[in-house]
């Protein structure tokens, strides 16, 4: 079964692109064939770190069709969706009858939804689950980059709904030291590349490798919802 992973949360700054960069690197490190798509015309973070990433203009419906053109040719498509794009995808998927298209392609959709300590990020997840219900799979990425408290999400109705009714999965993305994030951005390096780069000393390379191992283990724990299935 083919897989379309949309990394989506209408709120900006919740870690969509950072997770996307590391998920795509996971796929490369594991030798998993895929197509990566960036849709952020202001930042294009995914394409900056992975130059082989395709770019699609969300304002152009013909370009949006390229998501499914890619899925016709690949078993896995990963798309980093820019902030404030929830309404656009809801409208577009209704226009094309998403369920019918996925059925024709032999594919499933997974919404990968980063969440942090802010209520807006939780509200956006509620909005997506209200809209799509059981039509797709859900993976929530608990992003601790700014706070390790997820009290609002943990006490929310949507978390209970995801766990009890929708088969959702939660994975964690722990905080990476600020100076390491800044250095990765300054050098335009993925963590895998940084562990072999002279700009990073021994201890920082160790920090990066430890962080990456933890995230990769989290991704693998949700592989049945993130990767193609036989």
Language-model features: locations:
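Conserved C-terminal guanine-recognition region of P-loop GTPase G domains, centered on the G4
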Residues: 99, 119-135
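Inter-motif core of Ras-like GTPase G domains
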Residues: 90-117
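Conserved beta-strand segments of the P-loop GTPase G domain that flank and frequently precede/overlap
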Residues: 37, 111-116, 140-144
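Glycine-rich phosphate-binding P-loop
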Residues: 7-21
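Switch II (G3) loop of P-loop NTPases
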Residues: 75-93
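Beta-strand-loop-alpha "switch" segments that mediate conformational coupling across diverse proteins
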Residues: 145-146, 151-153, 160-210
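P-loop NTPase switch/communication element
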Residues: 42-57
């Amino acid at each position: 079964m083919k897989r379309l992973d949309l990394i989506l949360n209408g709120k900006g700054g919740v870690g969509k692109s950072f997770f996307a960069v590391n998920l795509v690197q996971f796929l490369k490190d594991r030798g998993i064939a895929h197509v990566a798509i960036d849709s952020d015309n202001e930042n294009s973070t995914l394409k900056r770190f992975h130059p082989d990433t395709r770019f699609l203009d969300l304002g152009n419906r013909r370009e949006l069709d390229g998501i499914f053109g890619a899925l016709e040719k690949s078993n896995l498509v990963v798309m980093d969706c820019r902030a404030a794009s929830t309404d656009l995808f809801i409208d577009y998927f209704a226009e094309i009858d998403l369920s019918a298209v996925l059925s024709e392609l032999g594919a499933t959709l997974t919404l990968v939804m980063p969440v942090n300590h802010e209520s807006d990020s939780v509200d956006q997840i509620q909005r997506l689950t209200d809209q799509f219900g059981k039509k797709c799979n859900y993976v929530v990425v608990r992003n601790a980059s700014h706070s390790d408290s997820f009290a609002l999400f943990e006490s929310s109705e949507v978390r209970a709904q995801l766990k009890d009714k929708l088969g959702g999965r939660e994975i964690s993305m722990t905080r990476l030291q600020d100076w390491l994030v800044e250095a990765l951005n300054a050098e335009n390096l993925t963590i895998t590349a940084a562990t072999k780069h002279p700009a990073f000393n021994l201890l920082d390379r160790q920090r990066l490798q430890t962080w990456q191992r933890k995230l990769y283990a989290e991704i693998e724990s949700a592989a049945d919802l993130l990767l193609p299935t036989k």
